[in-house]
Amino acid sequence: MCIRDSCIPLKWSANKRDFEPNETNEYNQIEYHEEYLLFANELDDINRTLDSIHGPAKLINAVFIKLLAGCGVREHQDVPTGRENIFSKTRRYHIPIITNPKVYMKCLDTDYYLEKGNVYELENTKNHGVRNESDIDRIHLVIDRLPY
């Protein structure tokens, strides 16, 4: 396993524990990073498309995540720690940007190849991990949506 993958946040909710989208308070702010403006139209298009498939939702997180060649992320669960935890309320999607058939997303003891050109929903409260056995860096756009 490598030290850490790298990421470029575009839009990010600052508070993961007590996130309540219908309230505005210091713990509930969504940060818009400078890079967001470069992809705002595309993110809106993606969100509208997912609205038509899964119903309306607010896009609250968007981040590009790079997993270096030969690296991985150990299996883990993004465990809700309380009733208001963000992971118990959102739906997470992976959109492969650069990938390889030797990059494996493992979820509940099954390996998957997430192919470029598709959108995948990941229930991240379930056991999951990833390993990049290829010789290229993998890049995904990962978004979290909060259903209305």
Sequence positions of predicted segments:
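Conserved double-stranded beta-helix
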Residues: 9-98
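Short, surface-exposed beta-strand-loop junctions and turns on beta-sheet-rich folds
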Residues: 81, 111-113, 137
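A short beta-strand-loop-beta hairpin characteristic of the jelly-roll/cupin
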Residues: 90, 96-116
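A short hydrophobic beta-strand segment most commonly corresponding to one strand
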Residues: 91-96, 119-121, 135-148
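Extracellular structured ligand-interaction cores
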Residues: 59-61, 90-94, 102, 127, ...
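Short, small-residue-biased leader/transition segments that mark boundaries at the very start
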Residues: 1-3
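Short beta-strand His + acidic residue motifs that chelate non-heme Fe in jelly-roll/DSBH
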Residues: 76, 103-105, 122-123, 127-135
